[in-house]
Amino acid sequence: MKKMQQLALPYLIWSILMLLLPMLLIVFYSVITSGNTIIPFRLTLEHYVRFFTDPDFLLILWRSLSIALETTIICLLLGYPIAYYIARCDEKRQNLLILLITLPMWINMLVRTNAWIGILSNDGVLVQFLGLIGFHDVQILYTRTAVLIGMVYNFLPFMILQIHTSLSKMDNSLIEAAADLGANRAQTFWRVTFPLSMPGVVSGIALVFLPSVSSFFIPKLLGGGQFFLIGNVIENQFITVGEWNFGSAISVIIALIMMLLMMLVRKAEKKSAVQEDRS
């Protein structure tokens, strides 16, 4: 036991230096402002008050939450059928399909998002195709639609993999038992398959929604600076404006929102696990 504690000590020190201290520093910056010659700073909540009393920042926060929700819903609607199909395939085909889904993830996300600029531009493949079928002068790049496409493209694999993991662990004898009891395919899916896959669905929702809320380079590249999300505001406060205190306050607010969402996800996972055990 003592040896294990000694082996864990370097990881504990690393976690404190790389995770805990930066978070504490951000919290500290969020509650201070410039002082006088005697006391260089003073405690204040003015940065939080500024955020919650400025309608522009609240609008951007709402926009970030809404587009993250849209991304999550689309990823779920697309990801579940794909994961279900993969789980129904034989092992060799499953491995091939999982490889094809994860293959783009081996490339840096920034590079993948940049590639969509060429696809969605006015001279790109998608706009040219839309022109051929009668939709002329369509502007996709630097719009909300472009940002949504980029979000779905980058985060869809996380949804698929989580749901596939739950479906692949499912006991197929339960489906056979449902069929023996007279349930048709639709009834079997909604009463057996879907409830048992809920842990994967909940995990997938978390892995898509949380990074979507705080994403900054996807809206920056595909939104062209015309579609700001809360991640862009934080980046702007730290790098461009130089208001580290206000940027830290926004970061803390987003972190608290994410912690709340994670608590809800954990609660949903426990509820799903209880239902699965009862099944």
Predicted segments with their positions:
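Interhelical loop and adjacent transmembrane-helix boundary motif
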Residues: 1-3, 48-56, 212, 216, ...
